[in-house]
Amino acid sequence: MVNGLSSYGHKIYATDISFTYKICKDKNITLLKENLLSKKKSNKIKNCDIFIHNAAITKSNKNENKSLCNANINLTKKALMLAKKLNCKKFFFVSSTAVYRKFSKHKYNERSKTFALDSYTKSKLIGERISKEFCSKNKIKFTILRIGNIYNGFEKIKWSRLNTSQMQRWLNENKKNKILKTNNFNTLRDWTFVNDIPKALNSLIINNQHFKILNLVSPYCYKDIYIMNKISNKSRSKDFIQLQEKHTINNATYSIYINRIFFKKWTTFQKAINLIRNYENL
């Protein structure tokens, strides 16, 4: 997101405690290695127009679920206070479409019911509520961005994730000529190429588009079997693609506002996989 937004000329101040992911060297990017939960804060940022709160802990041991939830809630509170201090005009809270998946549906949208299945989704739903209440009280425009199944082809577990995405596991297995596995061939998922997230977000910013809640997902939803066949170097066969279970849990999300968003050039999976393979061959 940092790399993508900076390419549009935005002046970016990025804060993180470790920066385990690659940030481009760019005159528009200033990296601040800080912890939002720390009592000591630098004064390197005087003010900003937009605050994007993307920080969240996703990993936890079974006995640390409560602390994960509390830490994420505290991160959100600190981010909101900082946004107020910096006189931000707009606050984006990055949430997840995982908040929908308690209920069995073919597809989910912004009007679907939400439920906290685990400490992570609980922290997201509480964070959404806190952000809404704080921003409304302090007259800060806000948007809750629920991000879906994003992929880029080069994910690393060290990027604070418990596991890589299903897409990345298939890509990794295919490179090693291993069997591609899924719970059900007909599981339907939304797939958003990671490069599209900053493009869509930039479009929202420069066009001053405002949504209280927005599923920031591409309009492309595919069944697992379609993606597996596209990734595979071989033709579909029982020896190559293995069905583990028969139960299907669809988690495809779409946005009811997709036609109102000015950004239209969402990357198809075929184009994305070609970009990934071209990059690998460099």
Model-derived regions, located:
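N-terminal Rossmann/SDR dinucleotide-binding element
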Residues: 1-50
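NAD(P)-cofactor binding segment of oxidoreductase domains
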Residues: 50-51, 63-92, 130
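Short-chain dehydrogenase/reductase
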Residues: 69, 112, 117-128, 160-168, ...
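Active-site Tyr-X1-5-Lys
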Residues: 102, 115-143
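NAD(P)-dependent short-chain dehydrogenase/reductase
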Residues: 132-188, 194
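C-terminal substrate-binding subdomain of Rossmann-fold SDR/epimerase-dehydratase oxidoreductases
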Residues: 175-282
